[in-house]
């Protein structure tokens, strides 16, 4: 199986209206058409979960919680897994995103978030500050590999928060005063569902309190097609400033 290669039929006018109003869109597998076999997607992710700490290739990030050293994320996948490259950077996701936003896009970050049992949550935040030096505007596709539930720490959004000037405190978190009275809505997903959201969505995650993994594949896309090499610059910078567990020596030009 390969990722879907025929042009995406597009999203509905209602989908576009919902996305513009709320800042996110949830699509089931039969609607998004990014792949045709969930079992194959899960097999690809199973393969990647076995990748070791090799040098100069993919990048593993870990977290320590309750005395356990847990795989948190694996980035820079596409060079080493052709089906995953097609899934994230092929015609289907780019056509889907253009149908939703009217814009052409280029991928600049690719990863799997593992969210293993016991994995940590995240305080309310925006993704924009972390990447704004590279892309002031971007959009993310999250593909649920496993079920995403309240119990295992699914994403929670404040709908419509992308329209607000959300204040960010010095530590990078959303200012506590803004959070007063805000309702975070859980993004409960079935395996194979897709969640699309933009850089300015206020969101949080709870810890995974179950004995089951809650993995997802992420593609992050910017809108400036005059910078097709932005992904290379991003990962060169990230290697220097946020090195992975399998840190290695690469010939890179640090982007500071």
From Swiss-Prot:
GO terms for molecular function: dioxygenase activity; metal ion binding. Induction: Expression is induced in loline alkaloid-producing cultures as well as in planta. Gene3D superfamilies: q2cbj1_9rhob like domain. Transmembrane segments: none annotated. Loline alkaloids show broad-spectrum anti-insect activity, and different lolines may have different biological activities. In vitro tests of NFL, NAL, NML, and semisynthetic loline derivatives with long carbon-chain acylations on the 1-amine have shown that many are effective against both fall armyworm larvae and European corn borer larvae, but the effects seem to differ depending on the modifications. N-Formylloline reduces the weight gain of fall armyworms by deterring feeding, and does not significantly affect corn borers. It is an enzyme of class 1 (oxidoreductase). It comes from the Eukaryota. Keywords: Alkaloid metabolism, Dioxygenase, Iron, Metal-binding, Oxidoreductase. Its cofactor is Fe cation. Its EC number is 1.14.11.-. Fe cation binds at residues 125, 127, 203. Homodimer. Belongs to the PhyH family. This is Dioxygenase lolE1. It comes from Epichloe uncinata. The lineage of its organism: Eukaryota, Fungi, Dikarya, Ascomycota, Pezizomycotina.
């Amino acid at each position: 199986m390969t990722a879907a290669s025929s042009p995406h039929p597009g999203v509905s006018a209602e989908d576009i209206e919902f996305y513009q109003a709320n800042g996110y869109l949830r699509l089931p597998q039969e609607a998004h058409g990014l792949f045709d076999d969930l079992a194959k997607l899960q097999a690809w992710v199973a393969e990647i979960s076995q990748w070791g700490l090799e040098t100069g290739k993919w990048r593993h990030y870990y977290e320590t919680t309750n005395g356990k050293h847990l795989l948190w994320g694996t980035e820079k996948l596409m060079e080493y897994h052709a089906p995953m490259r097609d899934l994230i950077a092929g015609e289907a996701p780019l056509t889907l995103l253009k149908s939703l936003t009217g814009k052409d896009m280029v991928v600049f970050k690719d990863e799997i978030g593992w969210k293993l049992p016991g994995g940590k949550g995240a305080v309310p935040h925006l993704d924009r500050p972390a990447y704004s030096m590279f892309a002031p505007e971007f959009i993310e596709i999250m593909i649920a590999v496993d079920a995403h539930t309240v119990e295992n720490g699914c994403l929670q959004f404040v709908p419509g928060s992308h329209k607000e000037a959300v204040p960010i405190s010095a530590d990078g978190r959303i200012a506590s005063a803004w959070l007063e009275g805000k309702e975070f809505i859980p993004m409960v997903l079935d395996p194979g569902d897709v969640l699309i959201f933009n850089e300015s969505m206020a969101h949080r995650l709870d810890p995974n309190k179950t004995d089951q993994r809650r993995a997802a594949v992420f593609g992050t896309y910017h809108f400036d097609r005059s910078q097709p090499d932005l992904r290379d610059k991003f990962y060169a910078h990230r290697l220097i400033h946020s090195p992975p567990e399998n840190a290695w020596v690469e010939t890179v030009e640090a982007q500071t």
